[in-house]
């Protein structure tokens, strides 16, 4: 499909660029088949992190696949929260393919899995940014009272506890 799209006479320049990136990422994926990944979390971070191209869908979907496998093995604690955070960031970037607000649920689950940790704080900040952006417009940011209250509650739950 990716190859056919790039070769289609009807394909726009953007579609042809996407095809090139997808084909490169698919080749990388094929080359990695059968190789043992020493640290799946780091591999997911590599695939989903850093500055990704505009057409990083293949890499992001690979990362989410790894993360879902990790979450099936261990769905509690800081590692699970970290996996949920990375998945949230990946789904945030994948939003344009129709997964709209799925990333928000990952951020919320991350906060629930490991409250009062640095990972939960990162998840809260990403969730807060998403909510703020969602209620932004040309006249400014207009967060409903219920959303502000929810954000305050989540912030309290997410922020690492300060040691006396």
Give the ranges of each region predicted by the language model.
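Acidic, polar-rich low-complexity tracts and alpha-helical solenoid repeat scaffolds
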Residues: 1-164
